[in-house]
C-alpha cells in the first residue's frame, strides 16, 4: 500500500495502526480506493516497534502513526502503543498522527490529554472547506461546527493542531463561497499550522466523474491564487504557520501569520495584477 504522510514527517518512523481510512468517503480522495478499513492488532504493532528498536532505539526521535486515521484506535490500546514507544525509543521527542474530525470528537479531552502526556504532540486534520453545503457535497461526514469542535478539542488538550484546506474544491462556481467560508472556519479553529493544497483530480473518485460529466469545472491557476489570497486576507490567527508549499500548489509559500500577512498578500497581488504565470509551478510539476 502507498504510504501517505505529511511532508514534516519525512524523517519519522512510520508506524501503521490502521489500514485505510475510517471514513473513506470524501469524493475527492483517492488515497484508499478499494481498501477495506481495519485496525491492526496491538501485538503486531508492538512487534513492529521492537523490530525497529533493535537497531535504532537511540536514534528514533519522531514517530508518525498512520494510515488515514490512527486516532480512531481504541484509547486503552493506543495508550499501550504510546507507552511501548517511550520504552523502546530512548530519545523520542514527538509522536504525530492523522486525525479525522470524527475521531477527535470521539475522544474526550481527558483522553487526548493522556495521549499528550505520553508524547502525542501533533495531529494533522483535514478541514478541506468551511462551506457547509460543500462539506455535504464532498461527503466529508461532519459539519462545520463539528470540525471546529474537533480542532478546538485538540488544542484544549495541548496537542498541536495542523489542518489542511483544499484550494479549488468548490470548482469555479463555488470558488468565492468556498474561500470566504474556509477563512471563517480557520479563524474559528485558530490552528497552529495551516497547509493549503490545490485540488487535483484522481481517476476513480466521484469528483473525477463529476468533472468528466461536466458537473465540476476546475479553477485556473490564477483563480487558485485568488482563493489563497482571500483565505489569508479574511482569516485571523493568534499565531499560525501558514504554508502552501505542497507540490499540488501553483505558488509555494511559507509564512508566519499574522506577522507577515501584508507582505504575503502583496506578493500574491503583484502576481495577480501582472498575470505573472511564469512564477507559478507548471502543471507537469504538480503532484499529490
Regions found by a protein language model. Give the residues of each.
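Auxiliary Fe-S-binding modules of radical SAM enzymes
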Residues: 2-9, 184-288
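Canonical Radical SAM [4Fe-4S] cluster-binding loop centered on the CxxxCxxC motif
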Residues: 4-44
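Hydrophobic faces of well-ordered beta-strands that scaffold small-molecule active sites
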Residues: 13-15, 63, 93-99, 123-125, ...
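Conserved, mostly hydrophobic/aromatic
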Residues: 21, 29, 45, 65, ...
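Aromatic/hydrophobic pocket-lining residues that form the small-molecule binding cavity
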Residues: 45, 78, 108, 147, ...
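Conserved SAM/AdoMet-binding glycine-rich loop
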Residues: 53-157, 236-237
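Conserved strand-turn element in the central/C-terminal portion of the radical SAM core barrel
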Residues: 102, 130-134, 154-178, 197-203, ...
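Catalytic cores of alpha/beta
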Residues: 110-112, 170-188
Amino acid at each position: 500500500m502507498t504510504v501517505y504522510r505529511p511532508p514534516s514527517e519525512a524523517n519519522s518512523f512510520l508506524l501503521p495502526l490502521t489500514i485505510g481510512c475510517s471514513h473513506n468517503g470524501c469524493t475527492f480522495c483517492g488515497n484508499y480506493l478499494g481498501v477495506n478499513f481495519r485496525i491492526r492488532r496491538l501485538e503486531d504493532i508492538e512487534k513492529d516497534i521492537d523490530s525497529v528498536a533493535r537497531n535504532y532505539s537511540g536514534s528514533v526521535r519522531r514517530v508518525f502513526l498512520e494510515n488515514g486515521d490512527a486516532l480512531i484506535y481504541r484509547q486503552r490500546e493506543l495508550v499501550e502503543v504510546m507507552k511501548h514507544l517511550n520504552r523502546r525509543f530512548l530519545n523520542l521527542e514527538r509522536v504525530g498522527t492523522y486525525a479525522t474530525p470524527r475521531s477527535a470528537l470521539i475522544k474526550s479531552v481527558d483522553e487526548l490529554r493522556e495521549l499528550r502526556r505520553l508524547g502525542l504532540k501533533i495531529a494533522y486534520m483535514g478541514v478541506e472547506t468551511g462551506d457547509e453545503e460543500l462539506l455535504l457535497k464532498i461527503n466529508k461526514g461532519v459539519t462545520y461546527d463539528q470540525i471546529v469542535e474537533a480542532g478546538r478539542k485538540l488544542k484544549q488538550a495541548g496537542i498541536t493542531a495542523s489542518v489542511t484546506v483544499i484550494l479549488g474544491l468548490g470548482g469555479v462556481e463555488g470558488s468565492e463561497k468556498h474561500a470566504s467560508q474556509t477563512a471563517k472556519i480557520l479563524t474559528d479553529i485558530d490552528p497552529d499550522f495551516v497547509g493549503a493544497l490545490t485540488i487535483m483530480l484522481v481517476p476513480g473518485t466521484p469528483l473525477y466523474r463529476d468533472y468528466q460529466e461536466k458537473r465540476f469545472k476546475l479553477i485556473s491557476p490564477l483563480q487558485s491564487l485568488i482563493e489563497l489570497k482571500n483565505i489569508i486576507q479574511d482569516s485571523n490567527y493568534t499565531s499560525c504557520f501558514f504554508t502552501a508549499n505542497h507540490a499540488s500548489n501553483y505558488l509555494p509559500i511559507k509564512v508566519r501569520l499574522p506577522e507577515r500577512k501584508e507582505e504575503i498578500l502583496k506578493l500574491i497581488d503583484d502576481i495577480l495584477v501582472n498575470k505573472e504565470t511564469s512564477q507559478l509551478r507548471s502543471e507537469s510539476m504538480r503532484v499529490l
